[in-house]
Design a protein with these regions (language model features):
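Flavin-dependent oxidoreductase catalytic cores
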Residues: 1-408
């Protein structure tokens, strides 16, 4: 038997997990009408039953203006009972329950969130596509308080941990990055100024979390394109988050509106993506320009590890969570042996919810995810799913596209 930390318990703040695995907060797209569903419960229960230490419900908006999708959770009192059903189901399977809280900022559209999208600065977001209004200085305290209110709702719903989304080009990330923050006040310009909104959010979060909820923060190590944040700045962000009270950092990267495949790696199956789209003009536009809008970034297992190791060297005070392209027991053990306290997975557990249990039995266990990104291509319109487990037959043209990508 290899020397492995994988199935040893470890703690994040007040929370102890039964092992080192966490289902990452990959968007499920299972909440039509912005409310929890039986499908969401069934999926997270299956992952918990599959042996994971904690499973994380993804991308819950702290305000209506922060919604990117009409199948995304929106935190408000009326959804607490539905969320409580989910946390109860997760706990019965022996896993902890986490929820990711965030605000999409400019990554929305009036048809989804009901207002002109807001962000760190005014401009035009080609991703949506839509004009964006920069948040006024006097609006920022209320926006920060929305995070704190959402933490309190998460506690009522029985969650053990919250993960604050400060990466991937969403609202906090939009304030941090010089690419999206063009403000002339004390919230723009220098890195110190660009961190002010994050500090404000974390103050509200930590006050609401108190001593009984674990607080993780997902952050970028790099934005993934020229003109975005690089490690010299993000290392300072990580150190500030430690000062702000974060109890673990999830080390990621990428910017959904500018470098989406830097987050996920591989190639987006454009034909599949547009097949599921409802909006005719968006379907046509993505079909014509998708390869340019969503350029491929080569996939390799543990693709963020080289950068993450730099943070492991500098950040000693709190646990670091590695996320990014893990599909085998061998690579997971390697990452843990590098000193990371936890690992996160999403696509591996979508492909095989019981993967963690299988790893307990097999030292050479490897899931069957082939990195076609079919699950992500459909996620923008309908629920996230692995094409290997569909009940319906895929159209021949989509099968051909997926098979081609899986051979790369």
């Amino acid at each position: 038997m290899i020397d492995s930390k994988l199935f040893t318990p470890a703690s994040i703040g007040p929370l102890t997990l039964r092992n080192r695995t966490i289902r990452s907060a990959a968007f499920e797209s299972m909440c039509p009408g912005n409310v929890p569903s039986q499908q969401l419960l069934d999926y997270h229960r299956s992952v918990a039953a599959g042996g994971v230490g904690m499973t994380t419900i993804a991308y819950a908006a702290v305000a209506q203006s922060g919604l990117s999708f009409d199948r995304q959770l929106w935190m408000r009192p009326e959804i607490v009972p539905g969320l409580k059903d989910i946390t109860d189901a997760i706990h019965k399977e022996g896993a902890a329950a986490g929820i990711q809280l965030g605000d999409c900022g400019n990554m929305s559209h009036k048809s989804i969130c009901g207002v002109t999208p807001v962000g760190a600065s005014s401009g035009f977001n080609l991703y949506s596509p839509t004009f964006v209004r920069g948040l006024r200085k006097d609006e920022l305290p209320a926006m920060a308080k929305a995070y704190g209110r959402s933490v309190n709702l998460a506690r009522e719903a029985g969650f053990d941990a919250v993960e604050i989304h400060a990466g991937h080009g969403y609202l906090i990330s939009q304030f941090l990055s010089p690419y999206t923050n063009h403000r002339k006040d004390e919230y723009g310009g220098s890195l110190e100024n660009r961190m002010r909104f994050m500090d404000m959010v974390m103050e509200e979060v930590m006050q609401a979390a108190g001593s009984d909820m674990a607080v993780l923060v997902k952050m970028n190590m790099r934005d993934g394109f020229k003109g975005g944040m690089e490690i010299d700045e993000t290392m300072q962000v990580a150190k500030r988050l430690v000062q702000d009270g974060a109890q673990a950092l999830v080390l990621s990267g990428g910017f959904v509106s500018k470098a989406p495949m830097y987050v996920m790696r591989g190639e987006m199956p454009i034909k599949t993506m547009t097949h599921y789209m409802n909006c005719w003009w968006l379907k046509y536009g993505v079909r014509m320009a998708g390869k340019w809008m969503i350029p491929a970034v080569p996939f390799k297992e543990a693709y963020f590890l080289e950068d993450a190791l730099k943070f492991r060297t500098e950040i000693k005070d709190i646990p670091l969570v590695y996320v990014g392209g893990l599909v085998s027991r061998e690579k997971i053990d390697e990452v843990l042996n590098h000193g990371f306290e936890f690992v996160q997975m999403a696509r591996a557990l979508l492909n095989e919810p019981g993967f963690v249990n299988r790893m307990r039995e097999e030292e050479k266990a490897r899931c069957n995810c082939k990195h076609s990104n079919y699950c992500i291509a459909r996620m923008y319109t309908i629920e996230m799913a692995c094409h290997q487990h569909l009940r319906e037959e895929l159209p021949a043209s989509l099968k051909k596209e997926i098979e081609k990508l899986e051979k790369k």
